[in-house]
UniProtKB/Swiss-Prot annotation:
Phenotype when the gene is knocked out: Presence in early embryos of an opaque substance in the posterior yolk cell extension at approximately 1 day after fertilization. This material progressively accumulates and by 48 hours after fertilization fills the entire yolk. By day 3 of embryogenesis, embryos are severely reduced in size compared with their wild-type siblings and they die a few hours later.
Protein name: Protein spinster homolog 1
Pfam families in alphabetical order: MFS_1 (PF07690)
UniProt lineage: Eukaryota, Metazoa, Chordata, Craniata, Vertebrata
Expression sites by tissue: Expressed in yolk cells.
Length: 506
């Protein structure tokens, strides 16, 4: 049995063992009335249901991540902390998420992805619930639990896109990825809205962290009931080719020599830097602008004014949907004219977002309406990247390396992006601030947020560079021909040793 036909495996089984119906009369035949399976081993109807479940979990993922941002003023007031310290809440989460991604990427390329996600999401739900019972003298415990939440999210984010890639190809894959990535802005916006409203109703920010755990347990149930593990690469593999696993080191060497993957990852890092900064600090910045101009009252007692979180959350939802949809459609139209369409659309999105983000920050004091209009435009252009970047990764990397590539991209984009940006913005704000007056609280955060516009321009440059290599790298991935894995003799430690071809090839 080929490896492509043997991917529905027990959790700790090797991929050389499979289960389910097989060809040539071996195994149990499918019932005659059952829908015909695709090469992935999953029926079309089950594939659609799988994408729906994965979208639900992705939405829940981002909803949980940004619930904290929706109640950040209350958390700062409750623990008596400043900008630099509160910025750590996002940083510790992203750091654990980032460092665990390679582990789950390695496991996702070799073991049953469905069960890995089930275990990770269950753990994430339990830890999130535990974080909602922390008292005011134990801020370190909140940091610890927010860090542990990254375990569950790393188990999901590195694996889910590769499952979609094994269910669909070409334009249908792009469409499904766009649906999947709609959940990012929608979930983020819902995090702001649900977090702030639950805080207002319950008059305690802790309750905002108790919404997603129950929904997470429902996600585990849906994963077990609905999702079926597809066969890796079977839907797009050439019939005469069998894809072999190579070592993790060989995978990493191959990825590092893939310029389209590396450059698009750096471009996506810029997106992560900007979105991470805005996600945590935009509502707080808008609130401080209102206090400075006298439109809002300062927060002396929780719950604080949540109108900015609600409006920013609604903007995030709408701009995310518009941005992802417009990015995908622009890419489809441009593909008829140039095979470099995807990185060019990503570059345009970042380069157009930069001036509008700059204007939104500078107009915060003068006009609230103008500020929201510029935020709307900036976030719309910024959101054009999500589905397209994922599609680029999937078509320039071969199937047996995709989870590892997802993990590598997560590590780099978070290490230099949203792991550092919230903390960096907070530290710069604290260093600029000359006093604790309302004016300096606003001005210092305003100046530090201007970094986002310049990072967006740098990201656009990386995507323009990606366009130079995209044709060649896509062709190499689509026409990848693995060698026969029969043993060959190589010199090792002064003697001849038989090893498999895949262990020495990159």
């Amino acid at each position: 049995m080929s490896q492509a036909d043997a991917d529905i495996t027990p959790f700790f089984a090797d991929d050389n063992e499979g289960e389910g119906p097989v060809e040539n009369g071996v195994g149990s035949p499918l019932p005659e009335d059952e829908e015909e399976e695709s090469p992935s081993g999953v029926t079309d109807r089950r594939a659609i249901m799988t994408v729906i479940v994965l979208c639900y979990i992705n939405l829940l993922n981002y909803m949980d991540r940004f619930t904290v941002a929706g109640v950040l003023p209350d958390i700062e007031h409750f623990f008596g902390i400043g900008d630099g310290t509160s910025g750590l809440l996002q940083t510790v989460f992203i750091c654990s998420y980032m460092f665990l991604a390679p582990l789950f990427g390695y496991l996702g390329d070799r073991y049953n992805r469905k069960l890995i996600m089930c275990v990770g999401i269950f753990f994430w739900s339990v830890v999130t619930l535990a974080s909602s019972f922390i008292g005011k003298d134990h801020f370190w415990a909140l940091l610890l639990t927010r860090g542990l939440v990254g375990v569950g999210e790393a188990s999901y984010s590195t694996i889910a896109p590769t499952i979609i890639a094994d269910l669909f190809v070409k334009e249908k894959r792009t469409n499904m990825l766009s649906i999947f990535y709609f959940a990012i802005p929608v979930g983020s916006g819902m995090g702001y809205i649900v977090g702030s409203k639950v805080d207002t109703v319950a008059k305690d920010w802790h309750w905002a962290l108790r919404v997603t755990p129950g929904l997470g347990l429902l996600a585990v149930f849906l994963l077990m009931l609905v999702v079926q593990e597809p066969k890796r690469g079977a839907i797009e593999a050439h019939p005469e080719h069998t894809l072999h696993r190579t070592s993790w080191l060989a995978d990493m060497k191959a990825l590092c020599r893939n310029p389209s993957f590396i450059l698009s990852t750096f471009g996506f890092t810029a997106v992560a830097f900007v979105t991470g900064s805005l996600a945590l600090w935009a509502p707080a910045f808008l609130f401080r602008a209102g206090v400075f101009t006298g439109v809002k009252q300062p927060c002396f007692k929780a719950p604080c004014d949540d109108s900015d979180s609600l409006i920013f959350g609604a903007i995030t939802v709408v701009t995310g949907i518009l941005g992802v949809a417009s990015g995908v459609q622009a890419s489809k139209l441009l593909r008829t004219r140039t095979p470099r369409a995807d990185p060019l659309v990503c570059a345009a999105g970042l380069l157009l977002a930069a001036p509008f983000l700059y204007l939104s920050i500078m107009f915060a004091q003068a006009s609230t309406v103008a500020t929201y209009v510029f935020i709307f435009l900036g976030e719309t252009f910024l959101s054009m990247n999500w589905a397209i970047v994922a599609d680029i990764l999937l078509y320039v990397v071969i199937p047996t390396r995709r989870s590892t590539a997802e993990a590598f991209q997560i590590v780099l984009s978070h290490l230099l992006g949203d792991a550092i940006s919230p903390y960096l913005i907070g530290v710069v704000s604290d260093s600029i601030k000359e006093s604790n007056s309302y004016m300096w609280e606003f001005r210092s955060l305003q100046m530090s947020l201007l970094l986002c516009s310049f990072v967006a321009v740098a990201g656009g440059a990386f995507f323009l560079a990606t366009a130079v290599f995209i044709e060649k790298d896509r062709d190499l991935a689509e026409n990848y021909v693995p060698s026969d894995d029969a043993p060959i003799v190589v010199p090792r430690s002064g003697r001849s040793t038989k090893v498999s071809v895949s262990s020495v090839l990159i």
